[in-house]
Amino acid sequence: PYTTLFRSSPELQNLIVAYSKSLYESPYRAYLEEKIGPVAFKNIELSLKGFDEKLIPLMQEENALTTEYKNLLASAKIEWEGEILNLSLMKKHMNSQDRDTRKRAWEKHTNFFVENAEKFDELYDKLVKNRTAQAKELGYENYIELGYYRMQRNCYDKDMVKCFRDQVKKYLVPFAEKLHDRRRQRLGLDKLAYYDAGMFFNNGNPAPIGTPEE
């Protein structure tokens, strides 16, 4: 079953890392880099920094928690005008041309998370503690550095991302505020609300046309 395979994936990853390590430490490394490129070996280096066999039990627990989280999201059954919809199907109504419909849809969507807040909080707390424990096992201060290795961020680090965040705040946020104000005027509203976030035109947003076959 998928769940069994997912829980076993850290053990499979252990085999992949062992194979990658043999390539990384190969006496033919220079030749291999010439053939498949240095980026592949940089990624191997990151994968070696982000994994150790002793982490397998913690990684299996992490997989179980993320699966539980996804299952909780998938369990949503929202009553909407005689239908039972999941979170994805509610998106259509959350972007309805009618503002009152949007508001009601957003409230229904939000209520699912409010009603399950305790379970979401519990899963989040367990995941944070699990990932922090993994980072500590590898000698890192917290999960940030380990997370970058696992995402294979091979050309930038957390300090560069902080610089980018600062630039977004300085340059993009003021620009975005102007765009949102233009959108508010176009929609004829005194003030934008959270349920207006996905609306751009009074006559509705552009929608796909045609059939899947086309």
Which residue stretches match the model-derived regions?
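A well-structured
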Residues: 1-159, 163-210
